From Swiss-Prot:
Disulfide bonds: none annotated. This is UDP-glucuronosyltransferase 2A2. Belongs to the UDP-glycosyltransferase family. One of its GO terms (biological process) is xenobiotic metabolic process. InterPro entries: UDP-glycosyltransferase, UDP_glucos_trans, UDP_glycos_trans_CS. It comes from Homo sapiens (Human). It is found in: Endoplasmic reticulum membrane. GO terms for cellular component: endoplasmic reticulum membrane. Coiled coil: none annotated. It comes from the Eukaryota.
Length: 536
């Protein structure tokens, strides 16, 4: 016979287990504040915050009243704090358009570099004025700051392209961390994050170089680092004053950025060249990539009609609205000559030379198309998001880079044998056709793309899980100071051991001087003795 006590013990055990699980859930649930950057950057951080919500965290996004992609939805589980600003969406659109056209018309070369940076300086000044409004909209808004103080946030995750997230975190007294793709020549990562970057084999971001450099390329690399350092130091001047004013003490933007607990870098070793890095730098490239989903019926039927030839996916990203009529006709003419069907994301006027094998779409499910077994190639502008989707699914690329990191991204893919590049400004229909035939017909491009895909998938932890882990880690431990290198506490001459080198040089010089003096003294002494003996 079974006693009542035998049932009571398991019941108490179950109650205790449920209580512990509930307590654990409460402990692990945190409050995360997001300081994003608009555009394609938002697409990455949006994936992170969606995963945080899935893990029972509360997420609040600070967004301006004039954004392109960051739209608050009443039904969304995300909380949005809208920052009032005087500029409009049209101002942001205009700034991005000017940036794209500057890069297309004056892509940095030895002949155009000064004209390029002169115009870039004007755009940076405009961006500074917009960014300052965003900062003031939070830091000089007592009501908003009071609400944020009451929010009980555990961590702030910021995209440093939009400056001030770190400043907001310091004013709230909470740890902060960054999520970023890069800064030109890794200037921010080197000077503020203290990551090592030997110029002999670490190519400067935007230099379009690889880790295998000739003597001439190493000269170019050294100049690239120095030039970007100069530009950033000039740009940081105004921010240094602003940061000092807000914090009420002398400081710099870079010193403040150096307080970041973790840097989530949106690349990985399938893309990057081997280089040294620090324990608080985590590579999470491709965190937005997912297995392909079924396509809309009409799109699937169009793809299936391609037969064994397959399809080509063509997209120049979300930032490029359309091309000139001449350029669109040139591209359409090349696409019409390949046996594959083409899905082209394009919003401009229908090209007169458009072939029967090509369909235009205002929007395409890019990730799902790249994951389709009939996809043979991807024509891309070289944005990091698109490149990682191609890596994830093992699709070779034809790069048509236009601005920012795109030329550098395509240079990485070319070096790894997974892409061919064509120049948007100078390409002909024959150039594009030749590039397409190369990546489709030469097996090495598909093989290299699949090799990168295998590397990407063969990770102990998925990129998204790794990113979220480190956010939760900072919340659990109130920071990650144990991963912060002592380089942050050194002056520039201590960091480069110039004081030690100087001391040793003085010691060696003194020793050499004393040896010489001893030799001279000995020579004089023995010389006098010799002369005295001769006289005797």
């Amino acid at each position: 016979m079974v006693s009542i006590r035998d049932f009571t013990m398991p019941k108490k055990f179950v109650q205790m287990l449920v209580f512990n699980l509930t307590l654990t859930e409460v402990v692990l649930s945190g409050n995360v504040l997001i300081w994003p950057t608009d555009g394609s950057h938002w697409l990455n951080i949006k994936i992170i915050l969606e995963e945080l919500i899935q893990r029972n965290h509360n997420v609040t996004v600070l967004a301006s009243s004039a954004t392109l992609f960051i739209n608050s939805n009443p039904d969304s589980p995300v909380n949005f704090e809208v920052i009032p600003v005087s500029y409009k969406k049209s101002n942001i659109d205009s700034l991005i358009e000017h940036m794209i056209m500057l890069w297309i018309d004056h892509r940095p070369t030895p002949l155009t570099i000064w004209a390029f940076y002169k115009e870039l300086g004007k755009l940076l000044d405009t961006f500074f004025q917009i960014n300052i409004q965003l900062c003031d909209g939070v830091l000089k808004n007592p009501k908003l700051m009071a609400r944020l103080q009451k929010g009980g946030f555990d961590v702030l995750v910021a995209d440093p392209v939009t400056i001030c997230g770190d400043l907001v975190a310091l004013k709230l007294g909470i740890p902060f961390m960054y999520t970023l793709r890069f800064s030109p020549a890794s200037t921010v990562e080197r000077h503020c994050g203290k990551i090592p970057a030997p110029v002999s084999y670490v190519p400067a971001a935007l230099s379009e170089l690889t880790d295998q450099m000739t003597f001439g390329e190493r000269i170019k690399n050294t100049i690239s680092y120095s030039l970007q350092d100069y530009i950033f130091q000039s740009y940081w001047g105004e921010w240094n004053s602003y940061y000092s004013k807000i914090l009420g003490r002398p400081t710099t933007l870079c010193e403040t950025m150096g307080k970041a607990e973790i840097w989530l870098i949106r690349t990985y070793w399938d893309f990057e060249f081997p280089r040294p890095y620090l324990p608080n730098f985590e590579f999470v490239g491709g965190l937005h990539c997912k297995p392909a989903k079924p396509l809309p019926k009409e799109m699937e039927e169009f793809i299936q009609s391609s037969g064994k030839n397959g399809v080509v996916v063509f997209s120049l990203g979300s930032m490029v609205k359309n091309l000139t009529e001449e350029k669109a006709n040139l591209i359409a003419s090349a696409l019409a000559q390949i046996p594959q069907k083409v899905l082209w994301r394009y919003k401009g006027k229908k090209p007169a030379t458009l072939g029967n094998n090509t369909q235009l779409f205002d929007w395409i499910p890019q990730n799902d198309l790249l994951g389709h077994p009939k996809t043979k190639a991807f024509i891309t502008h070289g944005g990091t998001n698109g490149i990682y989707e191609a890596i994830y699914h093992g699709v070779p690329m034809v790069g048509v880079p236009m601005f920012a990191d795109q030329p550098d991204n395509i240079a990485h893919m070319k070096a790894k044998g997974a892409a061919v590049e064509v120049n948007l400004n100078t390409m002909t229909s024959v150039d594009l056709l030749s590039a397409l035939r190369t990546v489709i017909n030469e097996p090495s491009y598909k093989e290299n793309a699949m090799r990168l895909s295998r590397i990407h998938h063969d990770q102990p932890v998925k990129p998204l899980d790794r990113a979220v882990f480190w956010i939760e880690f900072v919340m659990r431990h109130k920071g990650a100071k144990h991963l912060r290198v002592a380089a942050h506490d050194l002056t520039w001459f201590q960091y480069h051991s110039l004081d030690v080198i100087g001391f040793l040089l003085v010691c060696v010089t003194t020793a050499i001087f004393l040896v010489i003096q001893c030799c001279l003294f000995s020579c004089q002494k023995f010389g006098k003795i010799g002369k005295k003996k001769k006289r005797e």
